[in-house]
Design a protein with these regions (language model features):
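C-terminal helix-rich "cap/oligomerization" subdomain common to oxidoreductases
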Residues: 1, 25, 65-70, 295-335
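N-terminal Rossmann-like dinucleotide-binding module
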Residues: 1-45
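Beta-loop-alpha module in the N-terminal Rossmann-like domain of NAD(P)-dependent dehydrogenases
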Residues: 6, 34, 45-108
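Hydrophobic residues in well-ordered beta-strands that form the structural core
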Residues: 51, 90-91, 116-118, 147, ...
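Rossmann-fold dehydrogenase core element
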Residues: 104-121, 141-145
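C-terminal glycine/acidic-rich active-site capping loop/insertion
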Residues: 121, 240-311, 335
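Predominantly a Rossmann-like dinucleotide-binding segment in NAD(P)-dependent oxidoreductases
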Residues: 122-203, 330
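Contiguous beta-strand/loop segments that form the cofactor/metal-binding neighborhood of enzyme cores
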Residues: 174, 180-254, 290-304, 322
Length: 335
C-alpha cells in the first residue's frame, strides 16, 4: 500500500486526503504550521503520526511520497527538502510564486532522481477528459481556433478562500495553472500570449476575471476565458468539423458525416465532501480530485512520469507568468 505524508491541512487538503484514502493509499503522517489544527485534522482522517516540523517528518521517513498541500510560498522549501532527503514528491498547484522558484524545484528533483508531480486536477474532470480525447482523436482535423471558458473566483469562492482577495494577479495565479494546463493538453505548446485583466468588484483591487489569447505552435488561436460562468464551455473548430462541450457538459462533435452527442456527466456525489462545497465548486471539479489521485498513483506504481509531472507543469507555469507580464505591460508576450 502506498504511504503518504501530508504537508499542510488547509481548505483543499481535506478533499485531497479523503481522495488518497478512498483510492487505497494510506496517509501516515502530517505536518502543519499550526499544531492544534494538525491534531484535529489527524483525528478526523485517522492519520497516526503528527509532527512539529517538516524535518521531523523526513527524519522519521516511513512513507513513499511527500504530498505538499500548503500555500504556494512554502512549496519550494518543502520540495527542495524532500529532494534532499531522496523522497518522491507531489506539489499542489501553483508550483511556486515565481518562475525561477519553479525551475529550481524541477531541477532539484531531477538532480536527486526523485519522482515529482504537480496536483493539477482540472484536466481530469470527466467533461474535460472527453473534450481532450475528442480533439486528439483527429476527428475534426487540424484545429484552427479554440475557446476554453472556465469559472474564475467570484465573491462566494473568495469568501471560502479570503487570501484570494489580496493575491496579486489573482485570477491568473489561482486559475491560470488550470486553464493553461487544459489548453496545452488539448492543443499543444503555445508561442505567444496576450492577456487582459477584469476587475468586477468594488473594494477588491485584484483581477477576478481575464481574457487571454494564445497562439499555439501549430498555428491555432486559443482563447482562454476566465469569467464568472457556472459551468465550463469548450470549443474547437477544425478543418473537418467542430467540437463543443456545452454548459450542460454535453459534448457535440459535428463533421460532414453528421453530429455525435455524448453526455459527459459521468460522476456521482462523493459522500465525504460536504454538500455545500460540492454545490459551490460543482461535481465535475470535485470528482476530478480522486481521478487525478488515481492517475498519479498509477504512474507512480508503473515507474513512469505522471501526465502532470514537474517538467510538464513548468511549461504551464511559463504561460501563467507570460500572462502576468502581458497584464502588467498591456502587450503580447512571446513564450
Amino acid at each position: 500500500m502506498l504511504r503518504i505524508a501530508i504537508f499542510g491541512c488547509g481548505y483543499w487538503a481535506a478533499f485531497q486526503v479523503a481522495a488518497w484514502q478512498v483510492q487505497g493509499a494510506e496517509v501516515v503522517a502530517l505536518w502543519n504550521r499550526t499544531r492544534e489544527k494538525a491534531d484535529a485534522f489527524a483525528e478526523k482522517f485517522h492519520i497516526p503520526h503528527v509532527f512539529d516540523t517538516p524535518e521531523e517528518v523526513f527524519d522519521w521517513g516511513e512513507f513513499d511520497i511527500a504530498d505538499i498541500i500548503t500555500d504556494a510560498p512554502a512549496h519550494e522549501e518543502l520540495t527542495l527538502l524532500a529532494a534532499s532527503r531522496g523522497k518522491d514528491v507531489i506539489c499542489q498547484k501553483p508550483m511556486a510564486p515565481t518562475l525561477e522558484a519553479c525551475v529550481r524545484m524541477v531541477e532539484a528533483c531531477k538532480k536527486a532522481g526523485v519522482w515529482y508531480a504537480v496536483h493539477e486536477n482540472f484536466r481530469f474532470q470527466p467533461p474535460t477528459l472527453a473534450f481532450i480525447d475528442a480533439v486528439k482523436s483527429g476527428v475534426i482535423g487540424k484545429v484552427l481556433h479554440a475557446e476554453i471558458t472556465m469559472r474564475s473566483p467570484d465573491l462566494a469562492i473568495m469568501e471560502k478562500q479570503p487570501a484570494l482577495k489580496v493575491m496579486p494577479h489573482m485570477v491568473l495565479r489561482d486559475m491560470g495553472p488550470h486553464i493553461f494546463d487544459v489548453a496545452r493538453a488539448a492543443f499543444g505548446e503555445m508561442k505567444s500570449m496576450y492577456a487582459v485583466p477584469v476587475y468586477s468588484y468594488e473594494g477588491i483591487d485584484v483581477p477576478d476575471a481575464a481574457i487571454c489569447t494564445l497562439r499555439a505552435d501549430n498555428g491555432a488561436v486559443v482563447t482562454c476565458n476566465l469569467v464568472h460562468e457556472w459551468n465550463d464551455r469548450f470549443m474547437a473548430q477544425g478543418e473537418k468539423g467542430r467540437i463543443v462541450l456545452d454548459h450542460d457538459n454535453v459534448l457535440h462533435i459535428t463533421t460532414d458525416k453528421g453530429e455525435s452527442v455524448i453526455d459527459t456527466k459521468t460522476w456521482n456525489y462523493l459522500p465525504y465532501i460536504p454538500q455545500a462545497d460540492w454545490e459551490l465548486h460543482g461535481g465535475h471539479i470535485m470528482y476530478s480530485i480522486p481521478i487525478c489521485i488515481d492517475a498519479l498513483m498509477k504512474a507512480y506504481k508503473e515507474g513512469v512520469p505522471a501526465a502532470t509531472n514537474g517538467a510538464d507543469n513548468l511549461e504551464t507555469i511559463r504561460l501563467v507568468f507570460a500572462a502576468i507580464e502581458s497584464f502588467d505591460t498591456g502587450r503580447a508576450v512571446e513564450i
